[in-house]
A protein has these predicted regions:
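Bacterial carbohydrate/catabolite-sensing allosteric modules
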Residues: 2-24, 33-244
Length: 244
């Protein structure tokens, strides 16, 4: 087993993958791979998981209902000016479940629909915490009126919370923050992070089970897509809107 973070660079991906033999390659990122790389992996009989091709096994987190629940939570707390800090670029974001849920439910819950309330990341070499920190500074310097913010992942959300502190904004008294992933470290911060998570142990077990079945049978199975439910994990980073 090899766990790695490949640079989002065509040559780096080619060099890393071409020099190794993988029975299975699981893509846990939103990273894209060229047709050349995918053809190379398929030629080596590598089983691909979470790649946007016909022969790949796909494991999805069903977070649509949970993301809507997050929007309702903010609405019930009186928030109407809700921003978004993305760790991906604008082209990917509009096709990402998190971005889709945000856009779909803005009007449903009476939030202000302003494109300038969303900031994106175009530098995939940066760590998520730095992306959250820098884009948090950028967003709240430009729009201090925002009272709640969604962040693409928990690590970036912690970066946003650091940015808020430097700007003299309190969480959640001045700004409520919601992350995504449900990582353990978010529960250890003060305030603890409200986030969208899932049972990652069961998720991993089910993925391993399906992958092993596919390898042992050495034949495609009828079922290629597997869905896992997400859940809202309430922390201390969301509170009533105190700034009207």
């Amino acid at each position: 087993m090899t766990v790695c973070n490949i640079e989002d660079c065509e040559q780096s991906k080619l060099e890393f993958l071409n020099g190794r033999r993988f029975d299975v390659l699981v893509n846990f990122m939103t990273m894209t791979f060229s047709e050349k790389i995918l053809d190379m992996l398929l030629a080596k009989n590598t089983l691909l998981v979470n790649f946007p091709i016909e022969d790949s096994l796909m494991f999805h987190l069903d977070s649509r209902g949970t993301l809507k629940e997050c929007m309702k939570l903010l609405h019930d707390h009186g928030h109407t000016r809700v921003g978004y800090v993305s760790t991906i670029d604008s082209m990917r974001w509009v096709n990402d479940p998190r971005g889709i849920a945000y856009l779909d439910h803005l009007r449903t819950y009476g939030f202000e629909n302003r494109s300038e309330y969303v900031v994106f990341n175009d530098d995939y070499a940066k760590d998520s915490s730095l992306v959250g920190y820098e884009n948090g500074l950028k967003l709240f310097r430009a729009h201090p009126e925002i009272t709640a913010v969604f962040v693409s992942n928990d690590i970036a959300a912690l970066g946003v919370m650091r940015a808020l502190k430097e700007l003299g904004l309190r969480c959640p008294e001045d700004v409520s923050v919601i992350g995504y992933d449900g990582i353990q470290i978010g529960r250890l911060f003060t305030p603890s992070l409200t986030t969208v998570g899932y049972d990652n142990v069961e998720y991993g077990k089910e993925m391993a089970k399906r992958v092993i079945e596919r390898i042992l049978h050495k034949a495609p199975t009828a079922e290629r897509e597997f869905i896992f439910p997400a859940k809202l994990i309430l922390g201390e980073s969301v509170g009533p809107c105190l700034r009207k």
